[in-house]
Amino acid sequence: MRTPPVSAWRGEAGGSAGRPAGVPLPPARLPLVRGGRPLKRWRWVGAFSAGTMLCAAHATIGGVPVTWWAIWDGERLHERTQRRPGAVRMEPGRVRASPLDLRFEEGPGVEVVSPHGAQYVWTRKQAGMPIRGSVLGRPFEGYGFVDDTAGYHARHTAWRWSAGVGIAESGARIAWNLVDGVHDGPQHSERTVWVDGTPHHVPPQAFAGDLSAVGDLRCEAVAVRARRERMLVFASDYEQPFARFTGALPHAGSLREGRGVLERHDVRW
């Protein structure tokens, strides 16, 4: 197996010291294929309030677009997936689709580069920012999460992930990003807990096989977006519950309230 072109790296608050050189990374343009692996990239935006949880995303897999949105309105799940680029529109600090229009303030986030197979992957996570606008024709105010990802993932990739926002028993505003399967190295991972906006790298947190727990978090799913596809060289088994969270997080302590998502994805691409 060829040696990956990068070593794992993590940067916070816009810091770029040690950022891998010699390979294209956002915001530079990334080639469509590198080392025989097609480029995958996406922006996923989540927004969470007491009565509504939602996500919207735009992805390209080897140049082929797919967009989706899902909204849990407190009673039922609304969702749509389309294989065309304009159904979800992403702009700096804004996401729009037919049932939603939301604005938020962009920040530097936490940026991570990791080897993956014989190539590499990049991500930037922003979490806990106020997000406002309209959802299903009603005003919305909550807190958001943004996942920007790009890279040349291995042919078979599988991960489990959780992202959310909430309030600690201390009264601190918190957010989290926990993962197993990608960007999960012991020292330079994307695992992060934000406490009043300050990011803290955290050790691995074990995921229950049924996504009912992550570390000391307990997860109560309220609605599940799931999709299974098999098309020629592409196969995907995907599950993403919206959930309420109780329990505790490193650096944040016990939660007074928590809302967010979990995800299990096993894909050949």
Predicted region positions:
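Structured soluble/peripheral alpha/beta segments that form catalytic or ligand/cofactor-binding pockets
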Residues: 1-269
